[in-house]
Amino acid sequence: MSTQKKTINFLQEFSIPLILGVLIALVWANLAPENYHHFVHNEIIGHISLHFFVNDIFMVFFFAMAAIEITQSLLPGGSLNPLKRAINPLMATLGGVLGPALVFLGLNALIGSPEFARGWGIPTATDIALAWLVARVVFGAQHAAVSFLLLLAIVDDGIGLMIIAFFYPDPANPVAPLWLLLTVAGMLVAYLLRRKNVQSYWPYIILGGILSWAGLYLAHIHPALALVFIVPFLPHPPREEFGLFEDDPQDHSTLKTFEHEWKIFVDFGLLLFGLTNAGVEFSEINTLTWLVLIALVGGKTIGIFLMGSLATVIGFPFPKGMGYKELLVAGVIAAMGLTVALFVSGVAFIDPGLQGAAKMGALFSAVAAVIAFALGKVLGIKKVKDTQA
């Protein structure tokens, strides 16, 4: 492998572009806030600002990557097929969504404000890439907890997509469901392309994707979800032989080609996402910040641990190699909600001050990585090394 390829892999694996974008945004917004906000919200082409381009167009491809992972997991041989083998992590996922939402709403009722209540969806998110990275450091690459956590994060993202679509329409523009017929038309186009055995992904993206995007946009549902409805129609193998983040050299399907050719664009494009969404002034920290942080680190950990434990009690055991200690640490790792949590913060609140406060709570959730590492040491978690290394 060339030095250039190794460098690119390192940057992708450790989410360096996203982290770099977040750091630049934080420094810029606190040193020159007016200049930063002008850069982000100033119209660059017609009425399109950089913020709109990143959140409403670029993020279409980010959520498409998540949809690919979900699609692969549902194939025979994938981690969600057959469903029975995934019951324990699926129940843990349910706890990881309900736990933080309930903690957020409960704490908000005690110490918060009614205007904060819309933020309940923010702490339900788990960052797939960061969770995978930290899990490999804490457990080792081949530990069962890594696959458990990946499955949890993927389904969590799927639920997150539904939360964004159904609970966070633009309050200034009520949902106009009739326009969703365009999205249905986009799905029909993708289905017909699949029936005609069209192998290039471009017709699916250009014809089906644009129709889907237009339908969501005109219906006032976030258009970043457009390709989520198209990806499952891309031709793919009849079964999933390799795990997530693993390349099958024999897989030249349309689904795999689309992922392979766009993933590097998405991974490095997250620098722009971090730059345009994480520019929060520290002066905006308030009670909402701590509600998001506590709901993420506390609510998600407790929810995952309780529901994963309940699944074991009622007859759906942990994956081989996992126990209660590993479940607890996995719950802490899942509390990192950076990417999707930042995104939901932007659609949950109109007030820039509330957006900033919520985003700061999402950023602070990175502390979960430190907690997970320390907890793993205290509990004596044994790392499972990569046998292929």
Swiss-Prot record:
GO MF annotation terms: sodium:proton antiporter activity
Catalysed reactions, semicolon-separated: Na(+)(in) + 2 H(+)(out) = Na(+)(out) + 2 H(+)(in)
Record-annotated membrane-spanning stretches: 8-28, 48-68, 91-111, 119-139, 173-193, 214-234, 262-282, 288-308, 327-347, 361-381
A single Gene Ontology CC term: plasma membrane
Record's keyword terms, sorted: Antiport, Cell membrane, Ion transport, Membrane, Sodium, Sodium transport, Transmembrane, Transmembrane helix, Transport
Gene3D superfamilies assigned: Na+/H+ antiporter like domain
Pfam families per the UniProt record, alphabetical: Na_H_antiport_1
Membrane topology of this protein: Multi-pass membrane protein
Cysteines engaged in disulfide bonds, as pairs: none
Top-rank taxon, per record: Bacteria
BP terms from Gene Ontology: regulation of pH
Subcellular location: Cell membrane
InterPro entries tied to this protein: Na/H_antiporter_dom_sf, NhaA
Biological role stated in the UniProt entry: Na(+)/H(+) antiporter that extrudes sodium in exchange for external protons.
Entry-linked HAMAP family: NhaA
Family recorded in the similarity comment: Belongs to the NhaA Na(+)/H(+) (TC 2.A.33) antiporter family.
PANTHER family in UniProt: NA(+)_H(+) ANTIPORTER NHAA, SODIUM ION/PROTON ANTIPORTER NHAA-RELATED
Protein name: Na(+)/H(+) antiporter NhaA
Lineage: Bacteria, Bacillati, Bacillota, Clostridia, Eubacteriales
